[in-house]
A protein has these predicted regions:
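Non-catalytic, surface beta->alpha helical segment in thiol-disulfide oxidoreductase systems
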Residues: 58-84
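Structural alpha/beta surface segment adjacent to cysteine/selenocysteine redox centers
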Residues: 23-30, 41-53, 57-61, 66-67
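Generic alpha-helical hydrophobic packing signal
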Residues: 18, 27-32, 73, 79-82
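Thioredoxin-like thiol-disulfide oxidoreductase module
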Residues: 33-51, 77, 81-84
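Intrinsically disordered, low-complexity peptide-like regions
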Residues: 8, 15, 31, 35, ...
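Residue-level signal for short amphipathic helical patches enriched in basic/charged
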Residues: 7-13, 51, 69, 73
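Local sequence-structure signature of Cys/Sec-based thiol-disulfide redox active-site neighborhoods
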Residues: 1-28
Length: 84
């Protein structure tokens, strides 16, 4: 299974929702909390080109934010992306 990285910040309801969905699906993830990791913002911009939260990266693929995660979960792509 590919590594899932979730870029978050404090006081972010959409970040909490994304992490909760991953937990419900039994998907392990690494969290990069940019409120605690000031260098993480540059890494986020480099990896994804985005600076909004959350950002979900699966392996080297930037999935996107919460809406993208929900859509991938609904249409079955999430499992495919994890297995690829």
């Amino acid at each position: 299974m590919r590594v899932v990285t979730v870029y978050t910040t404090n006081a972010c309801a959409r970040c909490r929702n994304a992490k909760a969905l991953l937990v419900r699906r039994g998907i392990a993830y690494e969290e990069v909390n940019l409120a605690k990791d000031p260098d993480g913002r540059a890494e986020l911009a480099r990896r994804t080109g985005m600076v909004t939260f959350p950002q979900i990266v699966i392996g080297e693929l930037t999935l996107g934010g919460l809406d993208d995660l929900l859509a991938a979960d609904r249409d079955g792509r999430l499992g495919e992306l994890l297995a690829a």
